[in-house]
């Protein structure tokens, strides 16, 4: 049945005239935000296909597009790309004029390193502060592992500001993949009221000014689905 659903999804994709990004709930899906924000902020035109997560039909709906079982998924011509970092690398190759990685080789290596760190690490942050755009003002407990993750994020942002800081406010001066990778962390800190030193505050301020982020937050606010396991704090 999953194979049949996947084949049907492939047929749907081949009829598309532009890239299609399959995402989850905007209130909760941090990985969806990363891919969506990257494409939107870079002014890459795409169709959005939103699937409500954690429902009886979620797995079958996702299986129409990928057998990986997760969102986001980017559908490009004859190619299916899943996993946010793979989508980012593919976008950087497909649209080289968008300069989605820093031009300087050393800065690019740094950007890739901290993007990969976000991709593979920060487990305590994900578990203790799940992305929940509607839960403004909630407080969560801060065990040592979570505090260490928060401190590491602050150190990363502060280091980028010191090394690449500009009036644009992005982590490497101009917008790049890394800004999309850390976008959900900004929204987590916003929800749970994490105080930041000035050295780490430039990037969150810039990100929250983005029209794309404002659109995402407005859409998240209008969603009615509740995923109980993502509801943390008081």
Protein language model regions, located:
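Short, hydrophobic secondary-structure boundary micro-motifs
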Residues: 98-103, 126-128, 169-171, 198, ...
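Short alpha-helical linear motifs
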Residues: 74, 133-139, 170, 222-229
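Short, contiguous strand/loop micro-motifs
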Residues: 21-23, 49, 173, 190-191, ...
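GST-like domain detector, emphasizing the conserved glutathione-binding G-site
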Residues: 4-142
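GST-like fold's C-terminal all-alpha helical module
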Residues: 122-209
